């Protein structure tokens, strides 16, 4: 192996070893502690945090589970593309990944401690022009991630079972039930679109508040029946969009490993089509995948779906950009 790759601070683990061997970085991409040591396009960062969950804990293990699952596709050599025969398109051609490790959060750290650490880490990636892919962690991490983008106008596109527009949970303002309302009311994002909302956890006051503030909500059954083109028509072509994907947006039959599952939900193909449509229409500037909880999925299919959807989305947004 070229010695200069070691001197650069990169640990070369991409295609030199089979998926089941070596370091389980995301996609077996080089691990780069300092993004300035890389000429990558995409930086993957884990946020192993679930102190803000109000249901089943375990999402702190999500980043590790998704990294392990990502090695299923680690036969890719460097920036060579995959070919998605079903989509009739090459995927991830020319896109260079690095794994930037995890945000170092003290155990049980409250929001006033964890949020600045998260925002600072993501801000460093953005300063170096990297496209951030964030592995959660519970959904509360989305708010501090978004604050790292500063004052640029953002359209937040959310895939979720729940609206996450709850003002507080027993007086707590920064749980996994409130990242969207916090991001919206603070002006961190200017527009919000929600896909896949369903179930019995979203109260009428959340719905009314979101509606009053101009949130565009597509209920799950509505989104499943509509044409994809109709679902993305309101997104301005080329506008800056950040995608947050709560894995409970998927049917728990294919994604059981999550903290607050609900019957129903998107299939993989439905989610893929909609994600790719959003990424192709907008200017995607980052994404997160949250609420993957491997403690409730011994078959590891939840993490597998999560990672494949990341590949699909990044591929649609960045391939040969």
Predicted regions and their residues:
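Conserved alpha-helical scaffold segments that buttress catalytic/binding sites
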Residues: 2-321
